[in-house]
Amino acid sequence: VGLKQKVLFMKFISYSHNGEHKFGILNNDLITDLTGKISGATSLKDLILKKGISEAKKYASTNPGDLSVKDIEYLPLIPNPGKIICVGLNYSEHVKETNRTVEENPVIFHRFPESQTAHLQSIQRPIASDNLDFEGEMAVIMGEAGKHIKPEDALKHIVGYSCYNE
């Protein structure tokens, strides 16, 4: 998740090191481990729910990374999200590629957490599919729950963004 705050751009990461699932901030090729260090959070999802982003920013500014990305296995950014809600055919070039027409209402569908793929992991093609659908995908990570959110208030509910594969 890239978070742009006043001073520091933070790139969060979930990863496995020596068989333990952890999370931290990636700076170039070094990771500052945050597991259990910010509000007792044991995962990035936990950090977001505990509203620990500002505290993570302060911690990262004084604790440079010491773990190389060469020593970890990437995990999906948020391995256990509450919901994964997807919007399909949301840009015109992709609609043209699929020989479909633009719908009046967005095409909404869901994914399961187990379908996520982490950075540098292979994407498995289902047997029922002839090919993979190559497209740029982005995740919007919600930090605040809400219902009937006004468009002008929507950004207040977003904690970050990420490239996304599933």
Can you describe what each PLM-predicted range is?
Residues 1-9:
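Short, Lys/Arg-enriched N-terminal segments with co-localized hydrophobic residues
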Residues 9-106:
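N-terminal non-catalytic cap/leader segment that marks the start of a structured domain
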Residues 81-166:
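Glycine-enriched loop-and-adjacent helix/strand subsegments that border the catalytic/binding cleft
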